[in-house]
Amino acid sequence: LAMFRLFRINYFNPIVKIFATYLEPVSKSIFFFLNPLLAALALSLLLKFVSFYIAYSSGYEPLTLFFISVVDVVNSCFRILFYCVIGSVILSWVAPGNNHPLLQIVEEMSDAILQPIRKFVPPMGGLDFTPIIGLVLLNLINTSFIQIISSMV
């Protein structure tokens, strides 16, 4: 839900409506003092922290588990974006212009990542190299973030 809000995915999409219907009341009731984007992120962090605390409560301090949950949530977000970009590349070959709701979400999320890169890298000879650059940048940012947070723990 946080990624749908962050990338401004169309809320008339049936899949987004289902997620919003079930997850928005939970995040609003627990984190009523935050805006909806931060509430959804806080809910995902809380759920990840509770799952790690239940699994590893005897071996780690709670602050360490919190940092591990932050790293895992951010890593999951980057993996989703990574696979959305790969999915949009495959879909552009296989089924361009398909109106399936899930495919629309994949296209909108990958376009949000690739659109700033397309401003700097024009298509060369009919080939679009922005997905390759986007995947490299996503991997670089994810790896550097994980190393920075891991060094803090």
Say what each PLM segment does.
Residues 1-153:
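Selective transmembrane helix interface/packing segments
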